[in-house]
Amino acid sequence: MVIGLSHYLTVSAILFTLGVFGIFLNRKNVIVILMSVELILLAVNINMVAFSHFLNDIVGQVFALFILTVAAAEAAIGLAILVVFYRNRGSIAVEDVNMMKG
């Protein structure tokens, strides 16, 4: 059985849909929203690598590595901000994060 482009696009579409549903259905927990954004970025990376492979172009794979780097930094910074916010306020609910002073 040969894994074609349609298989990669199907998996990517499923991951993207799960990420969007995670953002829209869970509006109370910031950690779940961050994980949903990571799922969306993973779906984009799968698309880039799949098209790069099937078009015999390396640029998509290199760009996917840059996206993975930015996604890892975004997750680390986001979780660090949430830890500090939880220590100060005792909650990481979206309603509490929206009321930040700054």
From Swiss-Prot:
The chain crosses the membrane at residues 5-25, 31-51, 65-85. One of its GO terms (molecular function) is quinone binding. It holds the Pfam family Oxidored_q2. Gene3D superfamilies: 1.10.287.3510. It catalyses: a quinone + NADH + 5 H(+)(in) = a quinol + NAD(+) + 4 H(+)(out). GO terms for biological process: ATP synthesis coupled electron transport. It is found in: Cell inner membrane. Its EC number is 7.1.1.-. Keywords: Cell inner membrane, Cell membrane, Membrane, NAD, Quinone, Translocase, Transmembrane, Transmembrane helix, Transport, Ubiquinone. One of its GO terms (cellular component) is NADH dehydrogenase complex. Signal peptide: none annotated. InterPro entries: NADH_UbQ_OxRdtase_chain4L/K, NUOK/Mnh_C1-like. NCBIfam families: PRK05715.1-2 (NF004320), PRK05715.1-3 (NF004321), PRK05715.1-5 (NF004323). PANTHER family: NADH DEHYDROGENASE SUBUNIT 4L-RELATED (PTHR11434:SF21), NADH-UBIQUINONE OXIDOREDUCTASE SUBUNIT ND4L (PTHR11434). NDH-1 shuttles electrons from NADH, via FMN and iron-sulfur (Fe-S) centers, to quinones in the respiratory chain. The immediate electron acceptor for the enzyme in this species is believed to be ubiquinone. Couples the redox reaction to proton translocation (for every two electrons transferred, four hydrogen ions are translocated across the cytoplasmic membrane), and thus conserves the redox energy in a proton gradient. This is NADH-quinone oxidoreductase subunit K 1. It comes from Rhizobium etli (strain ATCC 51251 / DSM 11541 / JCM 21823 / NBRC 15573 / CFN 42). The gene is nuoK1.
